[in-house]
Structures are given as structure tokens and as C-alpha cells.
Amino acid sequence: LSLPAIEPVHVATYVESLKGHLSPPSIKQHLAAIRMLFDWLVVGQVLPSNPASSVRGPKYSSKKGKTPVLMADEARMLIEAIDVRTIVGLRDRALIGLMVYTFARIGAALAMQVEDVYIQGRRTWVRLHEKNGKLHAMPCHHNLDEYLHAYIKAAQLTEGKSPLFRTMQGRTGKLSGKPMTQVDAYRMIRRRAADVGIRTKIGNHSFRATGITEYLRHGGKLEIAQQMANHESARTTGLYDRRTDQVSLDEVERIVI
């Protein structure tokens, strides 16, 4: 088919063909990408209309996200077990702490430059580079303040426009000038979790979910958590709230056989 010949039925047939191979959220993501592509073609006057605009994806509703989270004591144990006598240890503690205490997305954290850690009103703040080029400023928890400044000082990060979280130069123990990738961060997190015997299959997003859950568990308000996490909707923030997991566990332990 040529581009002008594509009609809604063709897009709908493609979406239907994905069922059985992909989960509903993944199918909806595919459809969203197709819509965006055709929108771009319409704006560029390549096509007169978007054939995907009227196509609906599969129904999907979730009250709780699937991201694995840690208990507060597990997160504390993981952070405290990091050997901060090394630059890489200081870097890893700072990155994990950033995600826990600011609810930062991994992409926003890794996009930070050195100048994105700054002082305002006698407090340390961070500037997160969020989706679609949005900047999101957050004040630092006192622990995060310590983690960031210890890392920046030890690594001698003085160039404001340079990456904050960098890869290492082989086994030299020195930082390179290249920013960490999400794959680098994931491998680091899995390694740190294994070091302390955490068997939960956590990943880059787990610390964001852990931070939100613990904030709400200690009396934080959902609408404030939404602002801190930079979510468009409080419903999205609610997907990260795992307080009911502990309630459920307490209840099932009532079954005495």
C-alpha cells in the first residue's frame, strides 16, 4: 500500500493482529505511535487526514502498577551497603537517592548536567529534564543533599554543562565524559540489589515507585505526590502507591492452617 491508500480499516487490522502477541498497554502504545506518525504526515501536508485517529485500541484498566517496589528497610539497606570510598559508589548512591527522594524518572535523572544541582534559598535543588523537554525543579531531602555534594566534590565535577552521572573509564576508577545510559543504570541497580540479597526484580523505575509509596505511607498527600512526580494526573500517581500490598500481606497471614 502507498501512504495515501492507507485507511482506518488497515490500521485497525494491524492493531487486531497484535492481539495474542502483545499486552493491551503495548498495543495501545503501538497505536499511539502510529497516530503520532500520521499526525506528523498531515501537518507536513503529505496526507490529507490521519487514518489512525478513529481506530480504538483494546480496553485496559489498572488500579495498581506493575513496577516492583522495595520496602523502606530494603531501600535503606541497599543504599547503606554501597561502598562510598570509591567514585563509582558515590555516583551510584547519588543516582539511587535522587530517584528515591525526588521520584525522578530514570531518563530525567540521567539527562541531568552538573549545573542542574544548585543552591536556592540556602537549600540544594535539582532540575530534572523531563519528557517533551519539560524542566521540573525539586528541593533536595537532606540525605540527597549529602549524597549529591559528596559525589560532585569527590568526582571534581566543575564543568556545569557536562553530564552529572557518567560512565567509568574501564577499570581505572575514573569517570569518563559520557553520560550513563538506562541500560548502565539498570545493570548497576541489579548488581547492587544482588550484593545485599534483594530478590525482588527491581529496575530503574522501582525507586520512583518506592519513594512515592513511602511518602504516602507517612502521611503525604496524593495531590502533592502528583506534583513531585510531575504527573499530569493523580490517577497515574496512584498506580505507584503500594501501601495496600502490606495490608494484603497482613490479611493473608491470618489464614492459619
Model-derived segments and spans:
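Conserved catalytic core of the tyrosine transesterase superfamily
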Residues: 1-257
